[in-house]
Swiss-Prot record:
Its cofactor is Mg(2+). It catalyses: 5-(2-hydroxyethyl)-4-methylthiazole + ATP = 4-methyl-5-(2-phosphooxyethyl)-thiazole + ADP + H(+). Substrate binds at residues 38, 186. This is Hydroxyethylthiazole kinase. It comes from Streptococcus agalactiae serotype III (strain NEM316).
Length: 256
């Protein structure tokens, strides 16, 4: 349902993301059926966000200048009622990253918070090991998701060996995916963009259902890619993953 709607809408998804993953993110969105724009010029965004379906803010390659860009872009998105997805990359790795992430969450309207266990744990004051975008082990992703949902009053997606989605106090746990996905730089960052495209093309009447389908589409694409690339390595997996995203249909996830 939501995947077909995305393909029909072809949502313009503005991605202010990190320098490492821009190409992969754009190609992933195109494969899925969305329309990416990677603009980082405020004068440009003033017009783009009047017609955009969603905005992704990914703080991976953070600078003081980019912090100001995030703030200005979110202000424009909020003014135009464009949903904003925040990916607080490595929020627990430094005080500066934590400060920026909390500023964006507390002072602007965020539509979805997406991160790994360590990142989201840091935002809610839980003591967890963090080693950048890869994060550390978090024992209970479900409780972290619920706490973040309550603290920030925003839908939350927490990724790990089990993914947790929390919306208005309701939680859903998902276990699809491939162990090869974390071995390709940008798979987590692309996920943030994919979630933005999904909610940006929906009517927002049931975020839990929409996010569940988005996560399942993404993770099942990883499973398909793993089978295709078996024995070939992570380079082949990356290509197979984009192929799987481009060929994904709703009936392929019906029993997942």
């Amino acid at each position: 349902m939501y995947l077909e709607q995305l393909k029909e809408v072809n949502p313009l998804t503005i991605c202010i993301t990190n320098n490492v993953v821009k190409n992969f993110t754009a190609n992933g969105l195109l494969a899925l059926g969305a329309s990416p724009a990677m603009s980082e010029c405020i004068e440009d965004l003033e017009d783009l966000l009047k017609v955009a379906n969603a905005l992704l803010i990914n703080i991976g390659t953070l600078t003081k200048e980019s912090w100001q860009l995030y703030q200005e872009a979110i202000k424009i998105a909020n003014k135009n009622q464009v949903p904003v997805v925040l990916d607080p990359v490595a929020a627990g790795a430094s005080r500066f990253r934590l400060e920026v992430s909390l500023d964006l969450l507390k002072n602007y309207s965020i539509s979805l918070l997406r991160g790994n266990g360590s990142e989201i744990a840091a935002l809610v004051g839980e003591k967890q090991a963090s080693k950048g975008a890869d994060g550390g082990k978090v024992a209970d992703l479900e409780s972290i998701a619920v706490k973040a949902n309550q603290v920030f009053d925003v839908p939350v997606v927490v990724t790990g060996e089990t993914d947790a989605i929390a919306v208005r106090g309701e939680v859903r746990l998902l276990q699809n995916g491939s162990p090869l996905m974390p071995l390709v730089t940008g798979t987590g960052c692309l996920l943030g963009a994919v979630l933005a495209a999904f909610i940006g093309s929906s009517d927002r009447s049931d975020d839990l259902a929409c996010l569940t389908e988005a996560m399942t589409v993404y993770n099942v694409s990883g499973e398909i890619a793993e089978k295709v690339a078996k024995g070939k390595g992570v380079g082949s997996f990356q290509v197979a993953f984009l192929d799987a995203l481009s060929q994904m249909k709703s009936e392929m996830i019906m029993d997942k």
